[in-house]
A protein has these predicted regions:
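Conserved class I S-adenosyl-L-methionine
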Residues: 6-66, 81-85, 104, 111
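Class I SAM-dependent methyltransferase SAM/SAH-binding core
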Residues: 73-127
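Short N-terminal helix/helix-N-cap motif within the alpha/beta-hydrolase-1
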Residues: 103, 148-152
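A short acidic, Gly/Pro-enriched loop at the edge of an enzyme's catalytic core
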Residues: 126-137
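A short SAM/SAH-binding and catalytic strip from SAM-dependent methyltransferases
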Residues: 137-149
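A short glycine-rich, Lys/Arg-flanked "PGG" loop and its adjoining helix->strand segment in the class I
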Residues: 151-163
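C-terminal alpha-helical "lid/dimerization" subdomain adjacent to the S-adenosyl-L-methionine
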Residues: 168-225
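C-terminal lobe and adjacent flexible extensions of AdoMet/dcAdoMet transferase-like proteins
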Residues: 226-230
Length: 230
């Protein structure tokens, strides 16, 4: 993949491709995730078998106590469309919201403007600028199916998490719906919104079992949500 820059064709690496994809889709991103209009609802019903991202987001966030007061990493924060109210309410916590896309991050910053316990940081999940075992909770909603280096992302989110604490998230898994898999492989991946390879349920369970001692994992269509204890 390449773009024209100053009259010259410049090759894009995968990370840049992803950032450009999200910048070009900024006006529809929240609508699709939250089913904000009739076209989004039809898209979810047709290609995702009605799986409701709003419901999954609430299930993910329900793993986090309302009185949580530790260090929390949210990666990728995206536009914070699902997490805004929960993070704002956790006033005694220290929350780092990280995203590779500056465009997504700018939208998240607007939502968290004035809240000193929340910081928005541009960064790469495969190379987190954080100390080992520095987080009490790591949250990753709709991130791992987009990360270019999934192995490093799993390693880094594990590295920064304290022993006995929780890794919480949701992501797309392949093998549950031919229609969804076709959409992901032929449309979403080519747009740069998703990045192969993708795990099956069994492959994801095996990855998590190698890294975490307790796993609470649930399937909803082609999406999985989980809470793991290190």
């Amino acid at each position: 993949n390449s773009i024209l820059k100053n009259g010259k064709e410049v090759k894009l690496d995968m990370a840049d491709k992803i950032q450009n994809a999200y910048e070009s889709s900024k006006n529809i991103y929240d609508d699709v995730l939250t089913q904000g209009n009739i076209f989004s609802k039809l898209y979810i019903k047709l290609f995702w078998n009605g799986t409701n991202d709003n419901d999954i987001a609430q299930k993910v966030l329900s793993y986090i106590p309302n009185d949580f007061s530790g260090n929390l990493l949210d990666v990728p924060v995206g536009t914070a469309v699902f997490t805004e109210h929960k993070w704002i309410a956790l006033k005694d916590a220290h929350i780092a919201c990280l995203d590779y896309s500056m465009d997504m991050l700018e939208q998240a910053k607007k939502r968290f403007d004035g809240y000193t316990h929340i910081k928005c940081i541009q960064g790469d999940v495969s190379n987190l600028k954080m100390n080992d075992e520095s987080c009490d909770i790591v949250v990753s909603m709709n991130g791992f199916h987009a990360f270019p280096d999934k192995k490093k992302a799993f390693q880094e989110t594990w590295r920064v998490l304290k022993p006995g604490e929780t890794f919480i998230g949701c992501l797309y898994i392949r093998g549950k719906s031919k229609r969804t898999d076709w959409l992901v492989n032929h449309i979403l991946s080519k747009k740069g919104w998703f990045t192969p390879p993708f795990q099956t349920e069994e492959e994801l369970r095996n990855i998590l079992k190698e890294m975490y001692k307790q796993i609470d994992l649930h399937i909803d269509g082609s999406m999985v949500y989980f809470c793991c204890t290190k």
